[in-house]
Amino acid sequence: SDGYRYHDVFHFANAAILHWSPTFRSLLKRKRKSSPEIDEKEDGGRAVVVEEGLTAWIFNEAKDMDMFAGYNNVPMRILKNIRTFVRGYEVQACPMKLWEESILQGYSVFRAIYQNGGGSVVGDRNKRMIWVE
């Protein structure tokens, strides 16, 4: 098993660091229903599919890179593809550096959770960080 069953940690990283995760928002039942347009475009099914697809694609890339262990940077080609993938969604405004942080922190937590067979993940939106406790 490649540990993909722990992939929700990547959505948590996106929520904490990018302040964007339609998947995590849906899991927490925190969709923005007060605005039908935002609910449909930013929190709806297509946005969830975009995030899930992006997560699966990055995961497949990460397999060839030791799940980003020892990496201080994410390859520019991955970051550029992400920018293209999220065009038209509110998260397109996030700089590539935040995407890089989300990926690197998310994979650091993923590796710890996978190695330990689980764990408690904590996030801080103000500090844009996640970690394992």
Q: Predicted segment positions?
A:
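Metalloprotease/metallohydrolase-associated module, dominated by Zn2+-dependent proteases
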Residues: 1-6, 10, 17, 22-133
